[in-house]
């Protein structure tokens, strides 16, 4: 009984000391940047991650939604088609190569993303359709909203590497990681990326 109580108290103590990292993303012109990704990795070692449940990247009005999806390694993703036309979804990215040939409705099986990295999605029928799936092996991550803000919650105290990504940076390009120290209080960080959002 004492052991159980001790374990409970230890877990509660960890939760009490967890903080949040708030990132304010902006583009090259200083405007809020949508769909920027922040990945917080331990400075040493690896953190335990579990696959996420019920992740969908849909097709509607000949567009992918969402355009950027952030998942953990091992997550299965379904690709429902809500359009009245058929789509041919594919990725030729090294972390995951697959094709869902001409289909309507929901494919028979989801696609499992079992390696970290970025998978670029396209449609073999509609060339203007594009989306990105960012696969991470850390449990601390976030994607920025339209106001450029992203928030990673529940981060234990310690030293970390902050990795940043945005599709507008180009394939395989990401800024150098930033060293971040998390304590008991929330941490604020601003990131200006060399991305142009002008039409």
Give each language-model segment a name.
Residues 1-8:
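Bacterial N-terminal signal peptides that target proteins for export
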Residues 18-199:
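Extracytoplasmic copper-binding redox domains, predominantly the cupredoxin/blue-copper superfamily
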Residues 13-16:
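N-terminal signal peptide c-region/cleavage motif recognized by signal peptidases
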